[in-house]
Amino acid sequence: MPQLNPTPWFPIMMLSWLIFSLIIQPKLLLFTPTNPPSNKTTTTTRSNPWTWPWT
């Protein structure tokens, strides 16, 4: 049963972190969102109270 042999666990873990750090992470850091956030002025909307015709 190969999953019980702990010898290759550390090299496999280090290889996966190396792949993540050198290949995947730079691609994610270069991503620019299509709609960058902008400063918008907040407008307060005035709400009218409901009228209850049956009371």
Curated annotation (Swiss-Prot):
Component of the ATP synthase complex composed at least of ATP5F1A/subunit alpha, ATP5F1B/subunit beta, ATP5MC1/subunit c (homooctomer), MT-ATP6/subunit a, MT-ATP8/subunit 8, ATP5ME/subunit e, ATP5MF/subunit f, ATP5MG/subunit g, ATP5MK/subunit k, ATP5MJ/subunit j, ATP5F1C/subunit gamma, ATP5F1D/subunit delta, ATP5F1E/subunit epsilon, ATP5PF/subunit F6, ATP5PB/subunit b, ATP5PD/subunit d, ATP5PO/subunit OSCP. Keywords: ATP synthesis, CF(0), Hydrogen ion transport, Ion transport, Membrane, Mitochondrion, Transmembrane, Transmembrane helix, Transport. InterPro entries: ATP8_metazoa, ATPase_protein_8. The chain crosses the membrane at residues 10-30. Residues 35-55 are annotated as: Disordered. This is ATP synthase F(0) complex subunit 8. One of its GO terms (molecular function) is proton transmembrane transporter activity. Its main location: mitochondrion. It is a single-pass membrane protein. The keyword Transmembrane applies. The keyword Transmembrane applies. Belongs to the ATPase protein 8 family. Pfam families: ATP-synt_8 (PF00895). GO terms for biological process: proton motive force-driven ATP synthesis. It is found in: Mitochondrion membrane. Subunit 8, of the mitochondrial membrane ATP synthase complex (F(1)F(0) ATP synthase or Complex V) that produces ATP from ADP in the presence of a proton gradient across the membrane which is generated by electron transport complexes of the respiratory chain. ATP synthase complex consist of a soluble F(1) head domain - the catalytic core - and a membrane F(1) domain - the membrane proton channel. These two domains are linked by a central stalk rotating inside the F(1) region and a stationary peripheral stalk. One of its GO terms (cellular component) is proton-transporting ATP synthase complex. Residues 37-55 have a biased composition (Low complexity).
